[in-house]
């Protein structure tokens, strides 16, 4: 029987397993992967390649907040970290700003803070925000970044058994255990990033991910635009749920807003005569007030109290959020 000229389809080919290949040790000409880029690769491969491989940079609110959190730790001079051959087993100290590199690991890092407890060195990475509510105490990208720092310390000859993350907003410290699984994930991420950058390939953007809106490289990455060209459409964002609350606007010059009684009244009163006589008009929006429950129509019923200096807006129910008494209305042009 003559062989067919038609190439076999993908279904006819035998399945082949994937073999994980690590990148070779870095040389003097190769760029070393920063520990922060290990974090970025696990978080979003496209972000890591754009930043480290292609040099794309953009400032964001989160980035500026992170820089300020790091600067807050620089409150004064600290002793230098002794050489591992000189560091005593009973020695304890705190130090900052240590640079480490390893061609064998293909890694480099700028360590924020180092705790030395009885000769054991603990790298501490400072993060903005609160500690996440996860079993490990932190997400994998942050733990891998600390693990990369710990591996560099071990490579330099220091004893490092664990790492730590400091969350500035919640002021909590989380211990990072250097498990075999975490070390493997860190080395695989380092190798994959080096191989991807060396190949010149740019990973595809994340598919409709919640990570994208706050990313500093969103205008460069263009995930929605690329998804549209690939699929012809993008996933529609679900509309927000309808709220029964209505805004309340106060437009009386020199007025203030406050609760009149427990029944949910809002009183709009004039302040002192000298303030109300100012020429600047006052237009202020006073939050969202729940007026749906117990009301035949979601509107605010107005009741005049007979006085020329005050007006009351009677709500059928109490506030969804309590309004602070004597909340001032600020002038706006």
Curated annotation (Swiss-Prot):
Catalytic reaction list: exonucleolytic cleavage in the 5'- to 3'-direction to yield nucleoside 3'-phosphates
UniProt xrefs under Pfam families: Cas_Cas4
UniProt-listed Gene3D superfamilies: 3.90.320.10
Keyword Manganese: yes
Protein's job: CRISPR (clustered regularly interspaced short palindromic repeat) is an adaptive immune system that provides protection against mobile genetic elements (viruses, transposable elements and conjugative plasmids). CRISPR clusters contain sequences complementary to antecedent mobile elements and target invading nucleic acids. CRISPR clusters are transcribed and processed into CRISPR RNA (crRNA). This may be a 5' to 3' ssDNA exonuclease.
Family named by the database record: Belongs to the CRISPR-associated exonuclease Cas4 family.
NCBIfam families xref list: cas4 (TIGR00372)
Designated name of the protein: CRISPR-associated exonuclease Cas4
Organism: Rhodospirillum rubrum (strain ATCC 11170 / ATH 1.1.1 / DSM 467 / LMG 4362 / NCIMB 8255 / S1)
Gene name of the record: cas4
């Amino acid at each position: 029987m003559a062989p067919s000229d038609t190439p076999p389809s993908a279904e006819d080919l035998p399945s082949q397993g994937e073999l994980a290949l690590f990148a070779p040790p870095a040389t003097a000409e190769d760029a070393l992967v920063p520990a922060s880029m290990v974090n970025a690769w696990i978080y979003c491969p496209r972000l890591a390649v754009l930043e480290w491989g292609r040099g794309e940079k953009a400032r964001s609110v989160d980035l500026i907040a992170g820089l300020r959190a790091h600067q807050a730790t620089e409150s004064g001079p600290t002793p230098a970290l002794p050489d591992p051959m000189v560091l005593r087993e009973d020695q304890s100290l705190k130090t900052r700003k240590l640079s480490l590199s390893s061609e064998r690991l293909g890694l480099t890092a700028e360590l924020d803070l180092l705790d030395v407890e009885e000769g054991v060195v603990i790298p501490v990475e400072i993060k903005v925000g609160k500690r996440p509510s996860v079993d490990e105490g932190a997400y994998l990208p942050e733990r891998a970044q600390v693990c990369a720092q710990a591996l560099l310390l071990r490579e330099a000859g220091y004893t490092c058994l664990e790492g730590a993350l400091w969350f500035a907003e919640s002021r909590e410290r989380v211990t990072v255990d250097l498990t075999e699984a975490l070390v493997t994930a860190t080395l695989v991420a380092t190798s994959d990033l080096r191989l991807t950058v060396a190949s010149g390939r740019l990973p595809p953007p994340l598919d409709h991910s919640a990570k994208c809106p706050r990313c500093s490289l969103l205008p460069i990455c263009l995930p929605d635009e690329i998804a549209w060209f690939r699929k012809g459409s993008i996933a529609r964002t679900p509309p927000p749920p309808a709220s029964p609350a209505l805004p309340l606007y106060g437009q009386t010059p020199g007025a203030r807003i406050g609760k009149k009684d427990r029944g949910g009244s809002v009183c709009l009163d004039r302040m002192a005569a000298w303030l109300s006589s100012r020429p600047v008009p006052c237009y202020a929006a006073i939050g969202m007030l729940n007026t749906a429950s117990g009301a035949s129509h979601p509107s605010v019923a107005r009741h005049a109290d007979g006085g020329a200096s005050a007006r009351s807006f009677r709500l059928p129910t109490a506030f969804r959020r309590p309004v602070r008494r004597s909340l001032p209305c600020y002038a706006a042009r």
